[in-house]
């Protein structure tokens, strides 16, 4: 019985990491990309997102609750999984370890980012271009955001590989090998988008 629960918990964890959390990540990166066009373009994009109907319901049920489940169960997996990269020097095993490490970094980064933006907004702060520019004016915070964004993107991109295996999309060694390179390409592409947005605020 406990084995069945574990199976379904892991399936749900895998699903929520892509739908809706992963989709939200991509949407967030796209909105932040408007910063490269200037403060006015970014503020307009941010205002559009803030003006969505049922925004709070969407944030709670489509973003925060799935994210909390994925994060909590992900921490459990990170501290109970047996890492074998030291024993087997294969790229997939190292990616397995990095998935767990970046998951913890992502949790810290996202928690801090939510505090600095969403919680601050509820306390009266205006989330706009100037807010992010002020945050990233600190070299320490700039470094923190670079590491955080890259970790988040890697965790999502590499997680797509696990998602494909978990849901029976890639079942053969060849398809899984191809999937590894595809997800690494996705990581590089999204990293470019994320870093471009960060440096647009600097």
From Swiss-Prot:
Location(s) in or outside the cell: Cell membrane
Main localization (coarse): membrane
Key words of the record: Cell membrane, Electron transport, Heme, Iron, Membrane, Metal-binding, Transmembrane, Transmembrane helix, Transport, Tricarboxylic acid cycle
Binding-site residues for heme, renumbered to this chain: 28, 70, 113, 155
InterPro entries associated with the record: Cytochrome_b-558 (IPR011138), SQR/QFR_C/D (IPR034804), Succ_DH_cyt_b558_Firmicute (IPR016002), SuccDH_FuR_B_TM-su (IPR000701)
Biological source species: Bacillus subtilis (strain 168)
Bilayer disposition of the protein: Multi-pass membrane protein
Name under which the protein is recorded: Succinate dehydrogenase cytochrome b558 subunit
């Amino acid at each position: 019985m406990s084995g069945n629960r574990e199976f379904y918990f892991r399936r749900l964890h895998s699903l929520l990491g892509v739908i809706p959390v992963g989709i939200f990540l991509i949407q967030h990166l796209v909105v932040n990309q408007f910063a490269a066009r200037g403060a006015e373009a970014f503020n307009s994009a941010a205002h559009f997102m803030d003006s969505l109907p049922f925004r709070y319901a969407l944030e709670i049920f489509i973003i925060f609750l799935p994210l909390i489940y994925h994060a909590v169960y992900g921490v459990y997996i990170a501290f109970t999984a047996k890492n074998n990269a030291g024993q087997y020097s294969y790229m997939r095993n190292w990616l397995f370890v990095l998935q767990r490490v970046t998951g913890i970094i992502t949790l810290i980064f996202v928690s801090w980012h939510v505090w600095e933006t969403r919680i601050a907004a509820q306390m009266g702060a205006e989330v706009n271009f100037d807010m992010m520019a002020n945050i990233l004016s600190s070299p320490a915070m700039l470094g923190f955001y670079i590491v955080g964004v890259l970790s988040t993107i890697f965790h999502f991109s590499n997680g797509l590989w696990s998602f494909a295996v978990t849901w029976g999309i890639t079942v053969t060694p060849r398809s899984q090998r191809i999937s590894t390179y595809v997800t690494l390409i996705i990581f590089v592409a999204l990293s470019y988008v994320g870093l471009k947005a960060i440096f647009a605020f600097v």
